Amino acid sequence: MTIDKNWLNRSNKDPGRSLRFTHQPV
């Protein structure tokens, strides 16, 4: 679940890219 937090943090800079990763099952 640590990766999910990393993507959320990146969403601040790339909301489009973060959304793509969050949609994928971890």
Curated annotation (Swiss-Prot):
<dbReference type="Pfam" id="PF23700">
    <property type="entry name" value="YsdD"/>
</dbReference>
<feature type="region of interest" description="Disordered">
    <location>
        <begin position="1"/>
        <end position="26"/>
    </location>
</feature>
<protein>
    <recommendedName>
        <fullName>Protein YsdD</fullName>
    </recommendedName>
</protein>
